[in-house]
């Protein structure tokens, strides 16, 4: 509603009030309030009209282009969604997503603006409903110094030094999983099995949960919670969000009992401070000697469980799908991994030294992340008006950076639609800054990226040791990105060829 329409509406309402013979005091108060609103709207309207907003379209009221965005998620056409608008409006364009005016920034400059200006120009933006599901004390939601402290705490488990302690255990878990659930099978569904694998790893490495029934409980709860992220956030019967809230409460009940038990075990020295993620977070002290609250420990255990489950399972599945279409790349992975295996003694597990030797396999993983990154990008909210590329992005608007605007552009990656791991064979630094951003960047770089890297490389190592090859039952299986990160719609069923 513009200022003139509001004035006309206000006059009509005022006439109704005066006809009801309201008291002079009430009329005076009402007129003052209405006048103030009108003045404020006129000023805001004039200010907004004086700004050079990015080109684009906001779509239908409230809905905006959310339906088109979700449709693109479902059909794996997010790249086209971005490129069509970029081609029409330029590297900076406006739209409306989830009921809010949004600016999408394309190219390295846009990525740099968002990823290098956390808490300077922009801050993380979650709806209250989603924040409640993620955990109000989680590293994904917290800002400023609270966020910094949580990252330091998580690094004790997820960083390189922490991973040194757990890599052997993770390697054994993955080897045993493949021996038990893959070997001896003619055909398997990759997505289904890697979900089981990642869930098992997380339950054991994060919480020391070995009980199958308890792991299955967490698994079922997690599937409901992740499915709710793009649902309508209404807490009423029949909606996924309500089921997710109930699931969160059930999950909290399960893990709260574990937390109390672990605190007792740590006090009595029946558990070590680095036994798993739960122990690491309970034992953490910041620079002032202050521990994390129980709520922060639980919320961040939840957050790591959620993050490791969906993005890692997506990439494990997609990397096998891409290698199936590029057999020469698969053979190079096989050669590298079998050479590493040949240098191990019977029963000796993979070490961080071995991970560093997986240079080509790491290139394959990076190329898979470039071509099919599980994450489209992330949202931020502007803290003040921002001037960028000749346009003003108003305070309070959403801003989105996206992997699609650089990962699949010929100007940054030659032949972007071709699977070429060799493009990453040079040492770090050969890529232009902010062109390859699968894990985000800046203060909010994915805290678990090294953990995910190690888990995926270990999976590939044990997979090629067990199988000399595989063939997809549907080589042209479609990719879908809704409601979870990109995955093949059928889960990528494959026929296995056992290594003799």
Swiss-Prot record:
Question: Looking at its record, which EC class is this enzyme?
Answer: oxidoreductase
Membrane topology, as annotated, equals: Single-pass membrane protein
Tell me about pH and activity. Answer: Optimum pH is 7.5.
Q: Which reaction does it catalyse?
A: taxusin + reduced [NADPH--hemoprotein reductase] + O2 = 7beta-hydroxytaxusin + oxidized [NADPH--hemoprotein reductase] + H2O + H(+); 2alpha-hydroxytaxusin + reduced [NADPH--hemoprotein reductase] + O2 = 2alpha,7beta-dihydroxytaxusin + oxidized [NADPH--hemoprotein reductase] + H2O + H(+); 7beta-hydroxytaxusin + reduced [NADPH--hemoprotein reductase] + O2 = 2alpha,7beta-dihydroxytaxusin + oxidized [NADPH--hemoprotein reductase] + H2O + H(+)
Residues the record lists as binding heme: 446
Q: What are the cysteine partners in each disulfide bond?
A: none
Tell me the Gene Ontology biological-process terms attached to this UniProt entry: paclitaxel biosynthetic process; sterol metabolic process
Cell compartment(s), UniProt: Microsome membrane
GO CC terms on record? endoplasmic reticulum; intracellular membrane-bounded organelle; membrane
What EC numbers are recorded for this enzyme?
1.14.14.182
Q: Does the keyword Transmembrane apply?
A: yes
| Family matches, as Pfam families | p450 (PF00067)
Say which family it is in.
Answer: Belongs to the cytochrome P450 family.
Protein function: Catalyzes the conversion of taxusin to 7-beta-hydroxytaxusin in taxol biosynthesis. Catalyzes the conversion of 2-alpha-hydroxytaxusin to 2-alpha-7-beta-hydroxytaxusin in taxol biosynthesis.
What name has this protein been given in UniProt? Taxoid 7-beta-hydroxylase
């Amino acid at each position: 509603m513009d200022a003139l329409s509001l004035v006309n509406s206000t006059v009509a309402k005022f006439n109704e009030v005066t006809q009801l013979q309201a008291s002079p005091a009430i009329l005076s108060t009402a007129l003052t309030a209405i006048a103030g609103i009108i003045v404020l709207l006129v000023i805001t309207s004039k200010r907004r009209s004086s700004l050079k907003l990015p080109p684009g379209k906001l779509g239908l009221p409230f809905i905006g282009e959310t339906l088109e965005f979700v449709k693109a998620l479902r059909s794996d056409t997010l790249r086209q969604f971005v490129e069509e608008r970029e081609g029409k409006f330029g590297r900076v364009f406006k739209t409306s997503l989830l009921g809010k005016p949004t600016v999408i920034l394309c190219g390295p400059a846009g990525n740099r603006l968002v990823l290098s200006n956390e808490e300077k120009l922009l801050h993380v933006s979650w709806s209250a409903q989603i924040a409640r599901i993620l955990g109000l004390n989680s590293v994904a939601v917290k800002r400023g110094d609270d966020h910094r402290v949580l990252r330091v705490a998580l690094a004790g488990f997820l960083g390189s030094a922490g991973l040194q302690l757990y890599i052997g255990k993770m390697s054994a878990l993955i080897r045993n999983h493949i021996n038990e659930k893959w070997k001896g099978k003619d055909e398997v569904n990759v997505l289904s099995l890697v979900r089981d694998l990642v869930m098992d790893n997380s339950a054991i490495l994060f919480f020391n949960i070995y009980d199958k029934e308890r792991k299955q409980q967490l698994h079922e709860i997690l599937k409901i919670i992740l499915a709710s992220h793009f649902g309508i956030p209404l807490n009423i019967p029949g909606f996924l969000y309500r089921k997710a809230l109930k699931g969160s409460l059930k999950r909290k009940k399960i893990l709260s009992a574990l937390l109390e038990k672990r605190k007792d075990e740590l006090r009595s020295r029946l558990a070590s401070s680095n036994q798993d993620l739960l122990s690491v977070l309970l034992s953490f002290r910041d620079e002032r000697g202050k521990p994390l609250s129980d709520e922060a420990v639980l919320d961040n255990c939840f957050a790591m469980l959620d993050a490791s489950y969906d993005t890692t399972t997506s990439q494990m599945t997609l990397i096998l799908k891409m290698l199936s279409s590029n057999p020469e790349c698969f053979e190079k992975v096989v050669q590298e991994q079998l050479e590493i295996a040949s240098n191990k003694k019977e029963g000796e597990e993979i070490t961080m030294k071995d991970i560093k030797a997986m240079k080509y396999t790491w290139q394959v993983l990076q190329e898979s992340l470039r071509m099919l990154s599980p994450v489209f990008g992330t949202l931020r909210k502007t803290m003040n008006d921002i001037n960028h590329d000749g346009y003003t992005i108003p305070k309070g608007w959403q801003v989105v950076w996206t992997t699609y605007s650089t990962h699949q552009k010929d100007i940054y990656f030659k032949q972007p639609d071709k699977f070429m791991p060799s493009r990453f064979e040079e040492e770090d630094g050969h890529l232009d800054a902010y062109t390859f951003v699968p894990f985000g960047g800046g203060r909010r770089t994915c805290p678990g990226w090294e953990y995910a890297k190690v888990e995926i490389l270990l999976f590939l190592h044990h997979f090629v040791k067990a199988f000399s090859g595989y063939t997809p039952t549907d080589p042209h299986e479609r990719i879908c990105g809704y409601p979870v990160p990109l995955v093949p719609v059928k889960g990528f069923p494959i026929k296995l060829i056992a290594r003799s």
